[in-house]
Amino acid sequence: MSKQTIFIDVILPLSLPNLFTYRLPEELNNDIQIGQRAVVPFGRGGKLYSALVKNIHHSPPTEYEAKYVDSLLDDKPIVNQKQLKHWDWIVDYYIANPGDVFNAALPGALKL
């Protein structure tokens, strides 16, 4: 039986207007949940960031090749669906970037 590749959309703690898609290593397929933090490489240098999982799906990005998630930081979500919905409202109402809301909502100790 072949396993499907899982991709996740994450909010990076940077002032960027978009979510970014990462490929989940097969060994983490059963552990991933929306609202968990994942360690992901970003940029040409591959600097590691603590990003928040917003969506889980099976569709690879079309504009770039998805990098692999390095690891998961949490066993359980640290942000629930209701909070993420509120963050979406803040992004829309204040025309803010998701990363800015992420930075404002979570304490610095929860970031890399």
For the regions a language model picked out, list residue spans one by one.
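Accessory, non-ATPase domains that flank or precede helicase/AAA+ motor cores in DNA-metabolism machines
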Residues: 1-112
